[in-house]
Amino acid sequence: MFTVGPAVAVRVRTSSTVASAEVPVRSSGFRLADNLLCAKPVHLRRPRRLSVTMAASAGGPGSWSENILTYFLRNRQITAEDGAEILWYHAANHKCQMSDALKSAAHMIEADVLLPSDGSEHGQPIMAHPPETGSDNTLQEWLAEVTKSNKGIKLDFKSLAAARASMLFLDNVKQHLQRPVWINADVLPGPNGSSKVVDAKAFLDTVTSFFPDVTFSLGWTTGWHPEKVNEGYTWPMVKEMDYICSELTQPVTFPVRAALVRQSCSQLLWLLTKSSRYSLTVWTGKDDIYPTEDLLYIRDCFNKTQVFYDILEPQNYEFKQAIGIRVTL
């Protein structure tokens, strides 16, 4: 399924005063849902918008930590420093989905990595999303095909064991992957989260021991329930995430669930002020119900260089149409 998304973090200006953010040293294919009910918009007080300019905290040309807006602008694949211009192909796991993704107009390909059901770290990592436990595609095969393209990649690791088992495969193709590479894991419990988290320190240590120059995508486990009021990302959640990331030197994007962002804007705005390395990636669960108005609210609250949108249809099309970005189906 094809989705679209934006964002990059930067120097933050509140009103006319520039706030110096401390930087420490060191679902698959384009898919249009026939009928998706939109929840009634919640009228919340709008937090003060932060004006931001892009910072050069990411890596240089061709590095895994290069700002994706910089990379795709340089390659003339987008026209502006706007996270909403970045097109995503989500869950490009099986070979047919991977093939569709490589033929598509997507800039970034997202895929999930796990170990086969035996859980052995010596097993071959495969491309699948739970509850699946098998796949016709291994990570090694996936990388062999994707390296032939110029697309950026985001790999979502479902366990620490999967990450550890994947590092050598990534290292073997590193010289052929001179483009943005995002490494993702859910490292903290979030709103309604019930899935097991990946140990943050062990995950970060594992990845940085092989690839110190990478972009991290660090998220919260979440859930969404159609018959109850869903709380957003709380202050303790965002403060703990900042604590985990504060000693990193790499760019970090925080994947946040679209249906939970509007009620969390104050907390997430605060989080982005903590470092020029931070950004958001808005994503959607396949069964989530939320109005397109929520995406427009997010667009109004955050700077367009700080937020990427890896979202499903029909909201993706409606959102892009509303902000004047053409979507190629």
Predicted regions and their residues:
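N-terminal chloroplast transit peptides
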Residues: 1-25, 29
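Intrinsically disordered, low-complexity polyampholyte segments enriched for Lys and acidic residues
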Residues: 22, 34-35, 40
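A subset of signal/propeptide-processing and intrinsically disordered low-complexity segments
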Residues: 17, 29-30, 107, 305
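Phosphate-group recognition and catalysis centered on beta-loop-alpha active-site segments
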Residues: 2-5, 10-11, 38, 45-46, ...
